Amino acid sequence: VSIQQTQTLGPTVRLFHLPLKIRFKAGTAITDGIAHVSQTGEDFYFALPGKPEIVRVDPDYTWLAQVEFPLPAEMLHAQLADPADMIGRVLAVEQLATKQDKTTVGKLRHALNTDPFWGVRLEAAKALRQIHNDDARTALLAATNQ
């Protein structure tokens, strides 16, 4: 995992020194690792039992920070389907809004129609609007029948 601190450094703004939790999920197995962040840019390595399906940075929202952590669509789809992580689902939808493939539109449509949290459904509707293709339009129109 590569971590960059992007704040503009100066006399009153310095590098953060913090323990940052990174969570890896593969099936039902959850592995938490701690990255001790202290430099402008650092790479961290974690021993895992297999390829993770989901990777979450600061999953407990310990730090007040703007985290940009782009993930491949496959991981975002898995994160969107994780019933235990409501905020993770919202974050996945926000990233999926930049993808226009049929699989992603289908996953967003499913979230729009079935997610138990209204905030995820709202973000899914916004994402489909941003995707702005025929499949997304069809998904939005179908959702008006809820």
Description of each model-found segment:
Residues N133-Q146:
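Extended amphipathic alpha-helical coiled-coil/heptad-repeat regions
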